[in-house]
């Protein structure tokens, strides 16, 4: 009898965990993309590199991603990276909804280089439903300064008035400053 109850308990716990895993709310990061910012934060704790999913609460969010991966060219392997990141604005993420996108996945270095310059995507949720622009949209954050290794995407978005970062306070990381009293 105890063995039967134990089996039932383990089965029930497994079912509960699998339902919770399927009922996530967030953003699924496609292959060849890396997370740069989530709601203005770099390296968010809510991102699982294992499942490639950023766990989010329902509501408005912004995800900044860069295209970067290794691609084979004969016997060599080379890194191909986009100069400009994708900025995805999710206007109203619903509970139990996971947003992602589809794109023509490059199979080799030449295809990856071509894709990195244009980055055309189709936003959808994980059920395959294409999202209208009223629910989610994207743009490519271009720079008038050309290629730069250490771009500050948060500052660039803030200067354009397009940053969504509810926990970020602009200019808060400047250190100590003087007031009129010294």
Map each language-model feature to its residues.
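N-terminal signal peptide c-region/cleavage motif recognized by signal peptidases
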Residues: 18-20
